[in-house]
A protein has these predicted regions:
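Zn-dependent metallo-beta-lactamase
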Residues: 1-26, 33-37, 115-118, 162, ...
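Beta-strand-turn-beta hairpins that frame and shape the catalytic cleft
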Residues: 2-7, 20-27, 104-113, 142-148, ...
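Pre-active-site segment of Zn-dependent metallo-hydrolases
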Residues: 18-58, 63-70, 78, 121-125, ...
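Active-site neighborhood of phospho(di)ester-bond hydrolases with catalytic His/Asp-centered motifs
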Residues: 28-31, 49-57, 77-80, 148-154, ...
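Active-site environment of divalent metal-dependent phosphoester hydrolases
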Residues: 35-36, 58-63, 83-86, 103-106, ...
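Metal-dependent catalytic neighborhoods of phosphoester/phosphodiester hydrolases
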Residues: 40, 63-72, 87-91, 224-233
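Active-site-proximal loop/helix segment associated with metal-binding centers of metalloenzymes
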Residues: 114-146, 154-159, 167, 171, ...
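Cap/insert and terminal regions of metallo-dependent hydrolase folds
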Residues: 155-254
Length: 269
C-alpha cells in the first residue's frame, strides 16, 4: 500500500542523491556526504535507509557507503571491486549484491538496471593493494512511471541512444561540471579542462537518453558557470526543434517531487 502519492528526489551535491518512493523506502545513490563540503545532511541523520546503490569506487561516489552499511544494516548494490573493498572493511558479504552491466537486480523490492558506463573504477584496499572493476551507470525503478538514470561518471557515447530505447528512463542526473571544491583531493600535474562530459556533451547525452527531466550534477555550487553553459546548450538544441528534457538545477539540499500522475515539481530545501 503506497504511503504517498509522490516520489521525492533530493540532491546532496556532486552526484549524491536520495530517492524516497511512494512506499516510503529510502534509496541513497553514490552517497558522498561526510566529506562533501556542499552536503547539508549528516549520513547518520536518517531514521532508516533501505538501499544504497554505488556506481564506482571513486571517493566522491563511494562516499559514506561503508558507514551507512554499518549504521543501518542496509543492503548495497555495487560492482565487484566495491564489494571486495567493503568486505575487506568488515561489512557482511551477504548484505552486498554485486552486479554489472546488463544484470538487473532486485533488492528490498527495488529493481536496479546497471548499464554501460565509460569511466574507470579503482580503490586502494586496506592491505595497500589496488582493486579495479567495471564502473556502472544505472536505472532505478523507483516507482511506477519513475525510472531514474544515474550517469555514474560516464563519458558520452552513442549507445546512450540504445539505453533510451531499451529502458526508457524518465528522469536522470547528468554530470557536466568539475566540483572545484574537491579537486584538491587528487593532486596531479596540469588541469582538467572538462569533467567526464562537457556541458555540450551533457546536453546531447540528456537528449539522447530521451529523458523527460534532467538534473545536471557533479557540482557543489549551482552557480558554477558550467551549469549555465549546459542550460545554454539545451536551449540551443531545443531551438533546432530537437526534443529536449526539462532541466531543473538544484542546490545541495533541494528536492523535487514527482506526482503519481507525472511531471516534476521543484521544492525548496
Amino acid at each position: 500500500m503506497p504511503l504517498s502519492d509522490k516520489t521525492s528526489i533530493r540532491f546532496f551535491g556532486v552526484a549524491a542523491y536520495e530517492i524516497i518512493n511512494r512506499l516510503g523506502q529510502r534509496i541513497l545513490l553514490d552517497p558522498f556526504m561526510s566529506e562533501n563540503p556542499a552536503c547539508p545532511v549528516a549520513f547518520d541523520s536518517f531514521d532508516h535507509v533501505d538501499l544504497v546503490v554505488v556506481s564506482h569506487a571513486a571517493f566522491d561516489h563511494l562516499g559514506d557507503t561503508e558507514a551507512l552499511a554499518r549504521r543501518y544494516g542496509c543492503p548495497v548494490i555495487c560492482g565487484g571491486e566495491v564489494k571486495a573493498y567493503l568486505v575487506a572493511k568488515g561489512i557482511d558479504a551477504e548484505t552486498i549484491r554485486a552486479t554489472t552491466w546488463g544484470i538487473r537486480v532486485e533488492v528490498a523490492g527495488i529493481e536496479v538496471q546497471p548499464v554501460e558506463c565509460h569511466h574507470w573504477s579503482q580503490i586502494k584496499m586496506p592491505d595497500g593493494t589496488f582493486a579495479s572493476g567495471v564502473p556502472m551507470a544505472f536505472i532505478v525503478y523507483a516507482d511506477e512511471g519513475v525510472r531514474f538514470y544515474h550517469y555514474g561518471d560516464t563519458a558520452i557515447f552513442s549507445d546512450l541512444k540504445l539505453q533510451a530505447e531499451l529502458y526508457q528512463p524518465t528522469i536522470g542526473c547528468i554530470g557536466i561540471a568539475n566540483p572545484q571544491e574537491i579537486l584538491h583531493r587528487n593532486p596531479m600535474p596540469g588541469r582538467m579542462v572538462t569533467a567526464e562530459m562537457s556541458p555540450y556533451e551533457g546536453a546531447l547525452a540528456a537528449q539522447w537518453l530521451g529523458l523527460e527531466t534532467v538534473l545536471p550534477c557533479h557540482y557543489c555550487n549551482p552557480m558554477d558557470p558550467e551549469v549555465a553553459e549546459f542550460e545554454k546548450h539545451l536551449k540551443a538544441l531545443e531551438a533546432k526543434r530537437m526534443p529536449v528534457p526539462r532541466s531543473i538545477v538544484l542546490k545541495p539540499g533541494d528536492w523535487i517531487e514527482i506526482p503519481a500522475g507525472g511531471g516534476a515539481v521543484r521544492n525548496a530545501a
